[in-house]
Every structure is written in C-alpha cells, then in structure tokens.
Amino acid sequence: MLPPHVANAHQKGDIHFHDLDYSPYTPMTNCCLIDFKGMLANGFKIGNAEVESPKSIQTATAQISQIIANVASSQYGGCTADRIDEFLAPYAKLNYKKHLADAKEWVAEEKREDYARAKTRKDIYDAMQSLEYEINTLFTSNGQTPFTSLGFGLGTSWFEREIQKAILQVRILGLGSEHRTAIFPKLIFTLKRGLNLEPSSPNYDIKQLALECATKRMYPDVLSYDKVIELTGSFKAPMGCRSFLQGWKDENGVEVNSGRMNLGVVTLNLPRIALESKGDQDKFWEIFEERMGIAKDALVYRVERVKEATPANAPILYQYGAFGQRLGKFDNVDQLFKHRRATVSLGYIGLYEVASVFYGSDWETNLEAKAFTLNIVKAMKNACEGWSDEYDYHFSVYSTPSESLTDRFCRLDTEKFGVVTDITDKEYYTNSFHYDVRKNPTPFEKLEFEKAYPEAGATGGFIHYCEYPVLQQNPKALEAVWDFAYDRVGYLGTNTPIDKCYKCDFEGDFTPTERGFMCPNCGNTDPKTVDVVKRTCGYLGNPQARPMVKGRHKEISARVKHMNGSTIKYEGKHL
C-alpha cells in the first residue's frame, strides 16, 4: 500500500514509517489531546450507552477512564488529559455542594464548611486513586495498557489544588499492597513563575510535593510554562509522551489545543547519511535532501490515508467530541485536520552519531560541530514550514522517542557499514539531540548544551532528562535543576534509582545484565518479586516484566549519572 520508493526506503533503513501494524492498513490517527472538558460537559456516547454530564468527581473520573479506553482503541498513539485539575474542579465542587447541604441538616453551623471540605477532599483523593487504578488495569483493543498522560499544575482554586495534591499523593503511595511504582498515567506537572516556582508563590507547597513524588516515583516530569509558550506558541501538555502541538487559533480567533491530534511520524536515519557521506559534508547535504524528499512523500501519504477515514470508523473521536467537534456520520473528517489544526511529524535520530562521523566522538564542546548539528535541525524545520504552506497541514520536527528504532537503525547500519567505533559499536543510536549517555556532564551542563535544539526548530516533540543518584533525602538538589531548567528547556524528566527487591528489601539501582536487570544484593531477577523502573525514553517502563529491545537495553545500561551520590537507598537484608 505504501508508495514503492517509500516502502523501499523503510525496508532498507533510510527512513522509518512508524506504526506499520496500524497504518496505512487503517486510517487511524496517532496521538491527541482529548477534549475532556467538552465531553464531560456535554455528554457522549460509547457503544449504545448515552452518557450524560457527571454529577460528582467520582463519576467524572469513571467517565474519563472509559473515554481513554475507547480513544486508545481508536488510535495507535498516546492520549493526554491536559489541565485535568482545572476541568475536573467543577465536578468536585458538586460534591462540595452536596456535602454542604447535608451539613446544614446534621452539623453545627460553625463546622459545616470544614465538614464539607473534609468530605470533598476524601472524594477527590478516592476519585484520583480510582482513575490511577483504572488506567493501569485497562486494556485497549490491541491488548495494551493505554499510553496516557495527565497534565496538571496551573489551577489555583481550593478544588484545583486538592486535585493536584491527590494526583501526587496517590502516585507516591504506589499500587497494591507492595506499593509498586505506577507506570501509567505519565504525570506532567507545570511549573510557572509566580504560581509555584518560587518559595513565595501560592502553590509552592505543591511544587514541594511534586519534588517528593519525582524522587520516589520519577514522575512527574515537568513543563516550564513560559518556555513551552516561547517554543510552541501557546501553552499545552504534550500528546502522549512528547508530541507538541503548535499554537493554533480557530476561525473565530479562539486558541484551541484540546481536541487536536497528530497524524503520524516518519523518522530519518541521520547517522546513515553521515556514514554514507564518508566525511564529506557537501555529500551529506546532498543525500540529506534526497532523503527529505522521500520523508515528505511518506508524510503526505500518511495525511492522505488518514483523510480517508469516516466518522463511523471512530465515533468517539469524530462524532462524540474527543477531537473537539461532533461530526455527522457522513461528514468529511478532513475539516478537523486541515488549516494546520492537525500536526504530522518528521522525526530524526542520532545527531550525536552524525557529528561523531565528522568531528570525533567528543565533539560536544566543539562549537563548529554543534553548529553543524543545529543546521541539520534548522534545515528540517525550514523544509517542514515549506511543506506546511504547500499542503495546509502542520508539518513539525519531532525528536523521535526511538524505543525500538534505536536498535533497528543501528543494526541495519552495522550490516551495511560494519562495526564503527562510537557509532555502530554501541549497538544503539543516541536519541534525537541528547548528550552522549556515556558521558557525565553536570545536569546544568547537559541542559545548557541541549536547550539549543528545540530552539533551533525541534518543537514538534522534545524532552530532556538528567540522570541522578538516589534523591529521596535530597529533594533540594532536584529543585535546583528544575529551577535552572525553567528558562532554558520546556520539558524535563527525572531519572533516579527507584528499583526494589521484595525478597531482600534492597532499594536503589539494579545491575544491568545481558537479559535485563538484577538485584545487586541477592541476585533476584524474578519480575514477580522485583520492581524495576527505567525510563525507556519519554515513558517509564518495567523492563523486567516487559523486556525491551537489545539496543534500548544497551543504551539504558550505558547511562551514567550527572550528579555524584549514592545509587542505593537501602542495601537489603542478607538472605
């Protein structure tokens, strides 16, 4: 079904046409920001069930879980509930009004408000805990847990603050009797100057709770409110793990984020172009232009295929509000995509390897080398802007997560070029613009180095992360990095040792093995009695329960800490 030259380029490893098990066989979309606010306010339909607007926060979160399950079965990428604290607050307020009415009948007047707040606080906590359990026990039509993210942190009312606190408290507690770390939903907390960033700001206490949560559970990742606006044109959480919409206004001049979507990704194998050019930069740019032409054709094909959908293919998306509008059964779905409402993404991998071909493996402090890599990002951005003008869809530059692609491209290039030192010999390619994981700059040096790449045009998808020792006794160290990052990067993740062995009670960093990870104290590798949590890239993963591809395992094993300190919280018992 793919154009022959696109299929050939994919099979050879020049490009990667993502999610071929779903697209183009089906006209599915990739990821989205679900319009929960509109769906909860106006009701929706799933199957034969007409669902009306909820009358409590418990019912609202139950409806959210059903929407997530249905949306995740109707697309192949992740979905995000952006600003969940704000859109759930009206339903928490309904709980409060009910409890206040009860209090007027049974509680002394001076205690009524305290009673209503205490009952509402418990309702909020229970609702958010139920949502966390629901998401972790849901399965989509393809048998996976939905890739879900919750964006929160900007609310200022009592209800919004309580929802923020409950999300973090539930995650800190953990899942089940063993209090395991929840992998889903991904938590994305927004930092904002004047709101929660500084000690004098009104929501600073919630930032402290977010720091505690990140030291114990790695999530939440954090968004820098002002930097996200600077990079993308408006504030919003990413769709799924890292895909960002650009700022966009409808025909009435109203800014719209929720209800928008991404139509798919095609990724360029940049290290291959560098290897093929044999150190000749003119040759590099010549091959680059040719591959960009193939990528363009692949992306245009993605758009054309998705446009062939009918609302009846995915009623939850097109007819019942997930995509922000309610189309008739026979309406043209393209009205939700065109005029740049939807994005389609040009991905890339391996800027580290590209520069290593031309400048050697320790090029990060070489200004000429860095300028070369930035010119690659700028060239992709300029091409995407031209394609956007030509086709009226928003083509964006996307820093591909490469969960498995890091392995595939490197493996294919090893077959073609052999074992090349610092490039294919590692058995993985470095994600997007990231600093070589084998090196140990400080967190500040790493972020200072990486910040230029989204600024150069990689705004359709990006994330930065730093590797830390155990931080639970030192949250101020993490706060220092968050504060430093605020004006520099838009999106930051925390990687810290939180593995646990339930046989000997060891807590800290498990030891990588050829097949997975092992408790360094007792040697336990049984996924039933260990909880190993690693950042696959954008999302966290349980590699002991669900092993990852060899290349990604090699990359995780090669990571070094960017800060000194112990990687062990508790050494464990001697068995």
Residue ranges, per PLM feature:
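Metallocofactor- and cofactor-centric catalytic cores in central/energy metabolism, strongly enriched
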Residues: 122-132, 356-357, 549-557
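Contiguous, well-ordered alpha-helical segments that form the cores/surfaces of helical PPI scaffolds
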Residues: 344-357, 378, 535
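Flexible, active-site-adjacent loop/turn segments at secondary-structure boundaries
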Residues: 82, 271, 344, 535-538, ...
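Conserved catalytic cores of very large enzyme subunits
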Residues: 1-340, 361-362, 366-528, 532
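Glycine-centered flexibility sites
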Residues: 347-350, 460, 538, 551
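Long insertion/accessory domains within large nucleic-acid-processing enzymes
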Residues: 523-574
